Amino acid sequence: MYSLPSQAMRPLSLSPCLTRSSYLRFRILSSLSLPPIFHNSQTRLSFSKNYTRPHLFIRNCTSITAKPSSEFNRNRTQDAPDEKLRALRELFSRPGVNIDAYIIPSQDAHQSEFIAECYMRRAYISGFTGSAGTAVVTKDKAALWTDGRYFLQAEKQLSSSWILMRSGNHGVPTTFEWLNDVLAPGGRVGIDPFLFSSDAAEELKEAIAKKNHELVYLYDLNLVDVIWKESRPKPPNKPIRVHALKYAGLDVASKLSSLRSDLVDAGSSAIVISMLDEIAWLLNLRGSDVPHSPVMYAYLIVEMDRAKLFVDDSKVTPDVMDHLKNAGVELRPYNSILSEIKSLAAQGAQLWLDPSSVNAAIMNTYEIAIEKYLTSNNNKKSKTKMHTDTTGQSGGPAGVFRTSPIAFSKAVKNSAELEGMLNSHLRDAAALAQFWVWLEEEIHNGAKLTEVDVADKLLEFRSKQSGFLDTSFDTISGSGANGAIIHYKPEPGKCSVVDSKKLFLLDSGAQYVDGTTDITRTVHFGEPTAREKECFTRVLQGHIALDQAIFPQSTPGFVLDAFARSSLWKIGLDYRHGTGHGVGAALNVHEGPQSISFRYGNMTPLVEGMIVSNEPGYYEDHAFGIRIENLLYVKEVGTPNRFGGVSYLGFEKLTFVPIQTKLVDLSLLSAAEIDWLNNYHSQVWEKVSKSR
């Protein structure tokens, strides 16, 4: 860790004689001009502004003219014919293919959010580089679906050959609704079954069958790979490393023993694991195959008396080989997973398969092989045996279909993992403190810095911290209107210069050997408008409300989502993304099963030891974006009562980086909210100024 320059951070002094309107401009970080907010404890704040009725998500004001994104889409000029689409469509009539439409998802064979460059097929065919989206190509049309985080980015990146489908907006069809509408009845829709989860493939199959369409599994070739040809990047081949026990907190033998107990309880003889972070966590291994995520491409099958890791053995170092042997794990070639599934089925193995993550190629291979096994044993029943889990869901033939037990175990951090997360966050905070000092000095000295320049400099500061490995996602460095693109990625030669007269949003994170960070701050290097301050303050109020939430055990995350939106809702504003996601310990920056979101389907309870982000925001299209993000971990809290005999939970902060207070409209804050901000900044000074 690096100590901070003595002039960069100064202790706070809370003086009770100062009022809210008369507060000292001490600075926690000179780069942000961050004054503590003082108040007279005898005075209460009240809302004093009269608000006009909002129009949709954007309230009219004299300084901002925001156009709907659909208008920008209509005004796109016609591009030259898309040669990639032409080449792809030529393959539709190839023998053994014979399809009318082809679907290209974002995922790899493991349903990863971040994927190796060689698997970025949807980005290659469409030009849209956001992490979430699905492309559908027919013989005469091409459409791309993405969610609200990426509407503006997709508008910029898609050519006129593509139709942008804004998922979630009123009147926008789903992929299968669109296919049912544009294809003549009896069409054939092709997919690469390795790139769809079993659940997703079954849903698609059932939906298009309503118009008598057939879902065609193209096992032997991916059509995008065919046209990508030699220019397609090579698969990653970097070495795997052992994740030290002092960071993991639990050895592999203990984790496998617990998993095997789950197999016994489920009536299963083996489990197939395809999620890369689950494999890395279970085996205490880390890799470098996927950008920003310390994982390696592999499958894992755990049986009652053995385990098999399907991986490119050129990545396996002698240390890793010894580590695996000691845990009783054998190596198999990565591409032999289907043959192993067939072999286990031929023995009548009852496999545990998570249909939400295991790909359709594996699932379909298992089902076909089990049918053969039953036939060879003269068991020709019209309906094969099904196992049902505790939720009443049924699985495939002789299989146990339910959520992987590893996801929940991984989400509940042990003491060593929490310690590593806290330590890495303090080192990260020290790097950010130095970065913000540098950035404000540069801006005030008139330097012309692009959004990429800023992101690169932040990486430079972080890389000097001990244990630094990589960024945990592409840094979102957005000035002005670019900040409204929720997952904006600045590109060299195409990005903006950081404007001192506009809001600047910086969402970034890092991978350290002992932890994973994710933090967003929004700042202004000049004088913010009243509108910007109001929006920022309401986002801050939502952030504070969630941070202070106390809730009974077994509460799912969606119950808390409204805490973060309430202040925005009061004036008719909102944001189009979830409020919180799980975060891995030295693993993926986004992990499940927990979340805090307006989507009601996730009933996973928040449990002591889980980590979630707290990141409300507000975005005015083509104007500005605001987001404030800390990471929190769930802890038990003492309450004077325990209604129903249950424990109550709350949050503890992992992130300690100042929040720019000149963006705060004091008239909107309560005394308690002011206290929270002052206390938080006191903690920042106390913890980060001592970092080494």
Stretches found by the model and what they are:
Residues 2-692:
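Active-site neighborhoods and metal-handling regions in enzymes and metal-associated proteins
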